Amino acid sequence: MVKYISILGSTGSIGTSALDVVSAHPEHFKIVGLTANYNIELLEQQIKTFQPRIVSVATKELADTLRTRISTNTKITYGTDGLIAVATHPNSNLVLSSVVGVSGLLPTIEALKAKKDIAIANKETLVAAGHIVTELAKQNGCRLIPVDSEHSAIFQCLNGENNKEIDKLIVTASGGAFRDKTREEMKTLQAKDALKHPNWLMGAKLTIDSATLMNKGFEVMEARWLFDIPYEKIDVMIHKESIIHSLVEFIDGSVIAQLGAPDMRMPIQYAFHYPTRLPSSYEKLNLLEIGSLHFEKPDLEKFPCLQYAYECGKIGGTTPAVLNAANEIANALFLKNEIAFFDIEKTIYKTVEAHHNVKDPSLDAILEADQWARQYANQLLIKKS
């Protein structure tokens, strides 16, 4: 069966890897829609290669510019409405959500309402509104297929298993770019230092989140919703080699793990062709060459953002959306070298502390909390500077 795919975020790290997968298996995958933010040069190349029916960019000006460069019949849209138009296009049956941040929330919700299966790589959508997204998927008979390597690993480990027999999920973490630094050394580190991820090729925002371990915190929150498992049964383990992508421990003491080379094309391909597998030419795992694997507990005093994520997830309501929004603001300013590395965790903590939580929130309440948190975090950092 051919999968007709729309990719939200086609010019990013996940999006370009996904298009590599499509190129490797043109008999199985066809592109219906693509979206980019500002990188219209790369999007132009993608349009010429994959001939999508519809694309979307950030602004009307970019859309107008793109129209002058494209001679195909591809429809060109823009903004949030454009994202939603791509996500809900009637010709697609699978949507890869790989845009960065909470901007993926509305198009994902609309895609589910349009009864599309979602290959989900945008973890912030589940962090901010996991209860809404998972319920919509159930109501509309849609599958949420994880793309993050850790969640894909758990998804594969649970294939054919009974969720009631799970004792715990163990999410692995590389530890990020600063894993071997002390708190004292981390004080003066800049964005260029954090962007040197030891194992994975990722976008800038995600690489900074990896350095703070906030990314791992978001993955814990995502796992809670994807697999309907309480936070008390989700552990994080530092595994510097990034060979074991995650593990599941069952009530009888058995542990199932998923291993593979650190290449995002593998979980993307698995999500695209689920429930069956396709052959690939990607690097095969050779444990004899690797020789040994190492594991350790995360240091929550050194990386408090992971602890914040657990605490905010357990509180629930609008607090996770506030956590995410404050992180997005601080992360972006750190990337511009406008704040110090530790200002990220301080901003998140102060913003969450100031928030008045709303339990069982509507989508509007979540979006309102998101906007409040962005404004509050910005004000904190303006006062600091």
From Swiss-Prot:
Belongs to the DXR family. This is 1-deoxy-D-xylulose 5-phosphate reductoisomerase 1. Its EC number is 1.1.1.267. One of its GO terms (biological process) is isopentenyl diphosphate biosynthetic process, methylerythritol 4-phosphate pathway involved in terpenoid biosynthetic process. Its cofactor is Mg(2+); Mn(2+). Catalyzes the NADPH-dependent rearrangement and reduction of 1-deoxy-D-xylulose-5-phosphate (DXP) to 2-C-methyl-D-erythritol 4-phosphate (MEP). Pathway: Isoprenoid biosynthesis; isopentenyl diphosphate biosynthesis via DXP pathway; isopentenyl diphosphate from 1-deoxy-D-xylulose 5-phosphate: step 1/6. One of its GO terms (molecular function) is NADPH binding. InterPro entries: DXP_reductoisomerase, DXP_reductoisomerase_C, DXP_reductoisomerase_N, DXPR_C, DXPR_C_sf, NAD(P)-bd_dom_sf. Keywords: Isoprene biosynthesis, Manganese, Metal-binding, NADP, Oxidoreductase. It catalyses: 2-C-methyl-D-erythritol 4-phosphate + NADP(+) = 1-deoxy-D-xylulose 5-phosphate + NADPH + H(+). NADPH binds at T11, G12, S13, I14, N39, N122, E124, G203.
